Amino acid sequence: MVIIRAKQLVTALNMPWRYRDEVAVINDAAVVIRDGVIIDVGTWEEIKRRHPHANIWDFGDNLITPGLVDPHTHLLFAGSREDELERKLQGESYEEITRKGGGIYKTVKYTKETSDQELLNILQKRIQLATSFGTTTVEVKTGYGLDIDQELRLARILKSVKSPIDVVTTFLVHIPPPAGRENYVKEVLKAIPHAGTTYVDVFCDSIAFNVEETRTILKKAAEAGYKLRLHADELEYIGCSDLVEELPIDSADHLLNTPPENVRKIAKSGTVATLLPVTILTLRTSKKPPIDEMRRLRVPIAIGTDFSPNSWCLNMQTAIELAVYLLGLTPLEALIAATANAAYSLRLTDRGIIQPGKIADLVIWDVPNYHWLAYEIGRNKAKLVLKKGEPLRFL
């Protein structure tokens, strides 16, 4: 049994957390861990009195929070697209680059040419780097195989990964091939029962799948026992976020072009709005999710990195910082979006908050209070990362 003492402890008290819900901010705090599980939380004075014989790890100058959960990544691919940054700076849009054979199509080519073992090595290295920034659970999608055999291959690689943290697997129906769109959807429907992932996700947008195709795919996935996620309203609004009324979608992601009236549909459905501020930066767009309406209607907000060849960021700390400076979340909202609500978007209710009975996925930060997680930009502030009570990184 171990007691971790900290200058400040911050956690949501419920999952999902909604705007103006209560939050625990405990100064001179302590957490008790036994066998990888949190068994007690309180002030240092309370905890040392209740557990006088436990070992003590004293981080009395530091902040402790739940481990970060990254609920939206595209970690499994080969190659890079750094040349496309110059094209974007010259005025080409993401959609234009994709339609000319770049973007996703370019990454598909690199990924197909890379062996299973090399892809697995790439994936494992990326997960390890994400962990060093405080991520203790990560969602990873397929999506860069394009043809069905390649997508099932990527799903097999995903399921074989050996990782120091938990990996939630998603079969992403990413983008249709340049020709044979109708037949491709039929092939997807046949393949879904064989994916073996936890989630199925569809990129529903102007350059990807339309609403009817997305509805058909997600309905089939739900019937096959998969949980559902959705890329919605990223590049344009074509009606994708309306699907939360019809299907049990755990998380609707991006939402840059979601009309305010659709926020009510999201709120009523219980779907989490997963926002991806790094992508807003890399798309060089002025569009932003309707945050004020989400707050008003108390939609649970999560954030993720959206790591991909288009937004090369494994660092959830950066997502927190940009959620504050680009989207206007408070540091406290951003932290909870990266912990309790990110976990809830994956329906992982055994982590993401610091409470007795929850898994001891925790981060000790080299800062004195939670404000510094956004106030200081650009440094890795994670001092100690704990997965089920075991240290993963210590500086």
UniProtKB/Swiss-Prot annotation:
Cofactor: Zn(2+); Fe(3+)
Record's subcellular location: Cytoplasm
Keyword ATP-binding: no
Cofactor note as given: Binds 1 zinc or iron ion per subunit.
Matches recorded under Pfam families: Amidohydro_3, HUTI_composite_bact
Gene Ontology molecular functions: imidazolonepropionase activity; iron ion binding; zinc ion binding
Residues given in the record as N-formimidoyl-L-glutamate binding sites: 144
Keyword Iron included in the entry's annotation: yes
Keywords linked to the UniProt accession: Cytoplasm, Histidine metabolism, Hydrolase, Iron, Metal-binding, Zinc
InterPro entries with a match to the protein in the record: Amidohydro_3, HutI, Metal-dep_hydrolase_composite, Metal_Hydrolase, MQNX/HUTI_composite_N
CC terms in the record's Gene Ontology section: cytoplasm
Pathway: Amino-acid degradation; L-histidine degradation into L-glutamate; N-formimidoyl-L-glutamate from L-histidine: step 3/3
Source taxon at top rank: Archaea
GO annotation, biological process: L-histidine catabolic process to glutamate and formamide; L-histidine catabolic process to glutamate and formate
Family: Belongs to the metallo-dependent hydrolases superfamily. HutI family.
Function text: Catalyzes the hydrolytic cleavage of the carbon-nitrogen bond in imidazolone-5-propanoate to yield N-formimidoyl-L-glutamate. It is the third step in the universal histidine degradation pathway.
Matches recorded under NCBIfam families: hutI
Protein's name according to its UniProt entry: Imidazolonepropionase
